[in-house]
Design a protein with these regions (language model features):
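A structural micro-motif recognizing beta-strand termini
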Residues: 110-113, 166-170
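Electropositive, beta-rich accessory/interaction domains or terminal extensions
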Residues: 1-125, 129-141, 150, 183-202
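Hydrophobic, well-ordered secondary-structure segments
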Residues: 104, 161-164, 176, 190
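Short, hydrophobic/aromatic-enriched beta-strand segments in well-ordered soluble domains
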Residues: 179-181
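A conserved acidic, glycine/proline-rich C-terminal tail/linker
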Residues: 146-167
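Loop/turn positions that initiate beta-strands
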Residues: 120, 170, 174-177
Length: 203
């Protein structure tokens, strides 16, 4: 069997983002959410269940070994800013110019797109190793934070979902670090897995 070879470093961590659980207005009610994370500087410890200092409100759908870290491509931010502007989004928790972490991600990354990334690919960083596990699916809290009703539909149609990572080797990571991608089995791309998941549910 031929061993996968290392690619050239495809990108870097633009921002590391942590969030605390807080109240989020959703229509006429309030729910708890850690969405809308904030960028932090310096090394951050990462263990099997995620980044030290980060919280999740609903552990039935967030967190766990296979969803320890959520990453989102920085390349999609202009798309979401335009989508919110065209939809006349309620600014709510977010500014017109979206800050890193606005999509709920722990890692805002450069150089990794869902259409070019496969489930099982490995991100090799100086202080840890992460494995692509599955795409993220939008929920009603994402819609509330983004400020317009079609936000989940827009994510489904665009395929700009981001991806979860499990922690293969705990350690530390920080903004500005480059990473190397080690190919996995290359059976299912992240965008393909996302379409399959969304086809099984109503958006």
């Amino acid at each position: 069997m031929v061993q996968p070879t290392l690619s050239t470093p495809p990108g870097r961590i633009q921002s590391v983002n942590l969030g605390s659980v807080r109240r989020l207005p959703v229509g006429d009610r309030t729910v708890m959410s850690a969405h809308g994370k904030r960028s932090v500087g310096g090394p951050v410890a990462v263990g099997p269940l995620g980044l030290t200092g980060d919280e999740q409100a609903d552990l039935t759908v967030h967190g766990g070994l296979s969803k320890a870290v959520y990453a989102y491509p920085a390349e999609h931010y202009p798309f979401w800013e335009r989508a919110r502007r065209e939809a006349g989004a309620d600014v709510g928790l977010l500014d017109t110019s979206l800050p890193s972490g606005a999509l709920g991600e722990n890692l805002t990354v450069e150089g990794l797109l869902e259409s070019e990334l496969w489930v099982g690919d490995r991100l090799l960083l100086p202080g840890c190793e992460l494995v692509v596990s599955e795409p993220r699916q939008p929920c009603y809290k994402f819609v509330a934070v983004m400020g317009f009703a079609r936000a989940a539909k827009v994510m489904a149609e665009s395929g700009f979902c981001g991806f979860y990572l499990r922690v293969a080797r705990p350690g530390t990571l920080e903004a500005g670090q480059a990473f190397t991608l080690r190919p996995g089995p290359r059976e299912v791309r992240v965008d393909q897995a996302f379409r399959l998941k969304m086809a099984r549910r109503d958006v």
